[in-house]
Amino acid sequence: MADVKKVVLAYSGGLDTSVILKWLQDTYDCEVVTFTADLGQGEEVEPARAKAQAMGVKEIYIDDLREEFVRDFVFPMFRANTVYEGEYLLGTSIARPLIAKRLIEIANETGADAISHGATGKGNDQVRFELGAYALKPGVKVIAPWREWDLLSREKLMDYAEKHGIPIERHGKKKSPYSMDANLLHISYEGGVLEDTWTEHEEDMWRWSVSPENAPDQATYIELTYRNGDIVAIDGVEKSPATVLADLNRIGGANGIGRLDIVENRYVGMKSRGCYETPGGTIMLRAHRAIESITLDREVAHLKDELMPKYASLIYTGYWWSPERLMLQQMIDASQVNVNGVVRLKLYKGNVTVVGRKSDDSLFDANIATFEEDGGAYNQADAAGFIKLNALRMRIAANKGRALL
């Protein structure tokens, strides 16, 4: 791709992407536009501007995407009760399509003919970024330095940075032994001692939550208000999507909620161990299932449950911008029209317990479900014919001598 003139780089300001910035300038002799996304990762993003300016970058984008991230990506995903492989709440996966979208938007605004990212050739993120980019701008060029260069260790990156005058920190505060990724939905930890699947993670690894053992001895109760499948208020106070998630992270983390240690199957074929903190997302998943339990028709709920693993897989593997994900999203969103009401939760030492749910759109009828006298609301004698009709095929098979035992 020697003909690249201008490239938009997804830039964090850290060692890897700072080396990539200089490497792009030298290898491709091109202009580099930097893009730094604030997704609620809790780190200062402004230092990225100063570092990019020091490296001669003229066009610098630093975007606060927190509200868009939760409103247009996290909330739609949680309407489906999305979980990958039974446990993972897709905190990293769901952030990538938004970053890809902004990379392409900035490329269009600046006239760039290429984009670049710092994802390695071993992981899922390279796939997620690039599938999104090609879906939104089919002719875009993609530069993935980790698949091209020979700087395959941290020491080599440090040496390159020193040689080319890139500001780095060799000393100072202790660097975490883990590879971490954070946004408003979660923080993830990989590498280090976690590469041994038998070794327990260290307690001081966790950053967002207390251990369940050290959580308060007094339970915390909260009420979440839903409108069309999304949380709009906490304890009766209306909040923006990003504020909802930030507040639930704080409340959940204080009660030891949302820790996870799993081995997942990456799209590229390998298994990978990761630890995740997703306190707000853990609360949201439990609460959303609870409000759906009284507002969704049975067959709609069961169909959603059947389709959810496919929907989760599409997000995990980078197909957010695919026609099949968009089709599923329309179905999921249509199911949420009546998902309105309030869920009351008890948070205690790592546990999220639903203790109440109510809705003007509830399909729960106490007059029918009661164990007491129902006043004729339900005729129990009707069940006999229902059972016989549903047993018909099995009775026919038995009469034909089909062995079941």
Curated annotation (Swiss-Prot):
Q: Where does L-aspartate bind?
A: T120, N124, D125
**GO CC field:** cytoplasm
- The reply to whether Ligase figures as a keyword in the UniProt entry is yes
Q: Report residues binding ATP.
A: A10, Y11, S12, G13, G14, L15, D16, T17, S18, A37, G118
Question: Where is this protein localized, as stated in its record?
Answer: Cytoplasm
Keywords tagged on the record:
Amino-acid biosynthesis, Arginine biosynthesis, ATP-binding, Cytoplasm, Ligase, Nucleotide-binding
Instruction: Write out the residues that bind L-citrulline.
Output: Y88, S93, N124, R128, S179, S188, E264, Y276
**Which EC class heads this enzyme's classification?**
ligase
- Reaction catalysed by this enzyme: L-citrulline + L-aspartate + ATP = 2-(N(omega)-L-arginino)succinate + AMP + diphosphate + H(+)
Recorded E.C. number(s)? 6.3.4.5
Record's keyword annotation contains Translocase: no
* Alphabetized InterPro entries for the sequence: Arginosuc_syn_C (IPR048268), Arginosuc_syn_N (IPR048267), Arginosuc_synth (IPR001518), Arginosuc_synth_CS (IPR018223), Arginosuc_synth_type_1_subfam (IPR023434), AS_cat/multimer_dom_body (IPR024074), Rossmann-like_a/b/a_fold (IPR014729)
Family, similarity comment: Belongs to the argininosuccinate synthase family. Type 1 subfamily.
HAMAP family in UniProt: Arg_succ_synth_type1
Q: How does it assemble?
A: Homotetramer.
Q: What is this protein called?
A: Argininosuccinate synthase
- In which organism is this protein found? Pseudomonas putida (strain W619)
Q: What is the lineage of its organism?
A: Bacteria, Pseudomonadati, Pseudomonadota, Gammaproteobacteria, Pseudomonadales
* Gene behind the chain: argG
